[in-house]
From Swiss-Prot:
Lumenal side: 542-548
Gene giving rise to this polypeptide: Sacm1l
Keyword Ribonucleoprotein on entry: no
Cytoplasmic side: 1-520, 570-587
Organism: Mus musculus (Mouse)
Function comment: Phosphoinositide phosphatase which catalyzes the hydrolysis of phosphatidylinositol 4-phosphate (PtdIns(4)P), phosphatidylinositol 3-phosphate (PtdIns(3)P) and has low activity towards phosphatidylinositol-3,5-bisphosphate (PtdIns(3,5)P2). Shows a very robust PtdIns(4)P phosphatase activity when it binds PtdIns(4)P in a 'cis' configuration in the cellular environment, with much less activity seen when it binds PtdIns(4)P in 'trans' configuration. PtdIns(4)P phosphatase activity (when it binds PtdIns(4)P in 'trans' configuration) is enhanced in the presence of PLEKHA3.
Chain ranges of the SAC domain: 122-451
Topological category with respect to the lipid bilayer: Multi-pass membrane protein
A Pfam family that the UniProt record links to this protein: Syja_N
Single biological process term from Gene Ontology: phosphatidylinositol dephosphorylation
Annotated protein name in UniProt: Phosphatidylinositol-3-phosphatase SAC1
Length: 587
């Protein structure tokens, strides 16, 4: 078994050092961080000075370097999600960011302002819901991956053995990672969604668990991170695992989602739906092959379910994806194109059964992972469904929940929980739990990528589309529009800073946060507001003749509308764009 991370910790603070004391039974270790030299050493409890200010903490997230120097990030509150095979799983709910420096007197005014902004970015990421950890169980690996490991792997610390794709505090833990003797203080933290339920069908009790692991490679927000990078990492890549634990038997079904794996972008420009751009110069096949080579190594066979529209602005993406699969010619990859919106228009969501019937035989071939109560592997999952739409959120989640239910039906029948001929959909109590969990999963993934809850969750929760659901989709769509255009630059910068895609250099002569604005940025909105206001005033305060009033209204109306279209034409100058890391522009 892996060396567990310490669960109970105390933080002792003095002006010169941070002392992190392990309080687990039998533990005598104390991690010492020198606030001046930043040196990390290991000591024993008797070395903690009695004058130190003491407080309990629940984990070390890591350290980060900002303009003012280093900061220590610790978990101060946690909430128990449940237990996975008798291992407690926690959600971190609050953090504290502690400066190594005692004063900021060494900083200039500009540096002070930059440091304040960087701290706001760090706190923004920490405020995002969905950070999970366990001090005794490896949450970053699927059941199947954990079953195929060597004895040496099982002896490693949680940090050493973790799948680095899903360790969101990997950059913050880089200093602790370099010193194996302190690894029990280093807590790998996953970002995504976890829910656990104790369920009963036919008087038989089993645990049902849903885990979504969000990749920290090519992570970001909706419109600024699309497609793949040169290493083949896809934007918004999420591995979702559904686990059943019954009478010592363990079963799991794994699916993935990720952006269409070619080089494309969709930069916000004030339009409701910016036109996606496919690069004309990038080597798509190189990135595409890198992506699927790694996917096949990790997961096996790939069944791609592409849910984008087959007309309009999404059509070129679907055609390019299909052509890339055909050109690659791999027997390990199968491609299914399903125009979700066309097939399900007019709220005909029952037509999703067409897709399920189409892939049923493939799903049976891929199977699922099952290990019996004696620890013997009964079946392996030989591949995954890789689903995507444009955002890999709303349409994708609907399909994933249906595929997962079909797999769960087979698992529960094999384990003897369901009788022969019994349908999972007929188990009202469990069905309610199942649908709500998948809807919550959809909302979590959507908030982390798009900034709002998911669309279409009324179908996931109830099995049908509702008028209230359509209204909520409209509200979330408007909220997404605002965030994607006017706050996502800051969100993207925050993620890049947290993950180490950008490193702060306090000696940098020019502040990266200082971006000069064109005259249009201030002048055009003011002109539009003034013109629109004058138009309203002219309507309310009629002139001597109706022709005079009409002339004034037309003049100011044309001025306001004209200015609006000029702003729309120059939309990219008005959106909140990232400042720290230059994102690809494929225009």
């Amino acid at each position: 078994m892996a060396a567990a991370a310490y669960e109970h910790l105390k933080l002792h603070i003095t002006p010169e050092k941070f002392y992190v004391e392990a309080c687990d039974d039998g533990a005598d270790d104390v991690l010492i961080i020198d606030r001046v030299s930043t040196e990390v050493t290991l000591a024993v409890k008797k070395d903690v000075p009695p004058s130190a200010v003491t407080r309990p903490i629940f984990g070390i997230l890591g350290t980060i370097h900002l303009v003012a120097g280093n900061y220590l990030v610790v978990i101060t509150k946690k909430m128990k999600v449940g237990e996975c095979f008798n291992h407690a799983v926690w959600r971190a709910t609050d953090f504290d960011v502690l400066s190594y420096k005692k004063t900021m007197l060494h900083l200039t005014d500009i540096q002070l302002q930059d440091n304040k902004t960087f701290l706001a970015m760090l706190n923004h990421v920490l405020s995002m819901d969905g950070f999970y950890f366990s001090t005794t169980y490896d949450l970053t690996h699927t059941l199947q991956r954990l079953s195929n490991t060597s004895p040496e792997f099982q002896e490693m610390s949680l940090l050493e053995r973790a799948d680095q794709r899903f360790v969101w505090n990997g950059h913050l833990l880089r200093e602790l990672s370099a010193q194996p003797e302190v690894h029990r203080f280093a807590l790998p933290v996953l970002h995504g969604f976890i829910t656990m339920h104790s369920c009963s069908i036919n008087g038989k009790y089993f645990d049902w668990i849903l885990i979504s692991r969000r990749s920290c490679f090519r992570a970001g927000v909706r419109y600024y991170v699309r497609g793949i990078d040169s290493e083949g990492h896809a934007a918004n890549f999420v591995e979702t695992e559904q686990i059943v634990h019954y009478s010592g038997n363990r079963a799991s079904f794994v699916q993935t989602r990720g952006s269409i794996p070619i080089f494309w972008s969709q930069r916000p420009n004030l339009k409701y739906k910016p036109h996606p751009q496919i690069s004309k110069v990038a080597n798509h096949m190189d990135g595409f092959q890198r992506h699927f080579d790694s996917q096949v190594i990790i997961y096996g066979k790939q069944v791609i379910i592409n849910l984008v529209n087959h007309k309009g602005s999404e059509k070129p993406l679907e055609q390019t994806f299909a052509n890339m699969v055909s050109s690659l010619g791999s027997g390990m990859i199968r491609y299914i194109a399903f125009d979700f919106h066309k097939e399900c228009k007019n709220m005909r969501w029952d037509r999703l059964s067409i897709l399920l019937d189409q892939v049923a035989e493939m799903q049976d071939e891929l199977s699922y992972f099952l290990v019996d109560s004696a620890g013997k592997v009964v079946t392996n999952q030989d591949g995954v469904f890789r689903s995507n739409c444009m955002d890999c959120l709303d349409r994708t989640n609907v399909i994933q929940s249906l595929l997962a239910r079909r797999s769960l039906q087979a698992q529960l029948q094999r384990l003897g929980v369901l009788h022969v001929g019994q349908k999972l959909e007929e188990q009202d109590e469990f069905e309610k739990t199942y649908k709500n969990a998948w809807a919550d999963n959809a909302n979590a993934c959507a908030k982390q990528y798009a900034g709002t809850g998911a669309l279409k969750t009324d179908f996931t929760r109830t099995g049908k589309r509702t008028q209230l659901g359509l209204l909520m989709d409209g509200f979330n769509s408007l909220l997404r529009y605002y965030k994607n255009n006017f706050s996502d630059g800051f969100r993207q910068d925050s993620i890049d800073l947290f993950l180490g895609n950008y490193s702060v250099d306090e000696l940098e002569s020019h502040s990266p946060l200082s971006v000069p604005r064109d005259w249009k940025f201030l002048a055009l909105p003011i002109i539009m507001v003034v013109a629109f206001s004058m138009c309203i005033i002219c309507l309310l305060m009629a002139g001597d003749t109706w022709t005079e009033t009409l002339a004034y209204v037309l003049f100011w109306g044309v001025a306001s509308i004209g200015t609006f279209f000029i702003i729309l034409y120059n939309g990219k100058d008005f959106v909140d764009a990232p400042r720290l890391v230059q994102k690809e522009k494929i225009d």
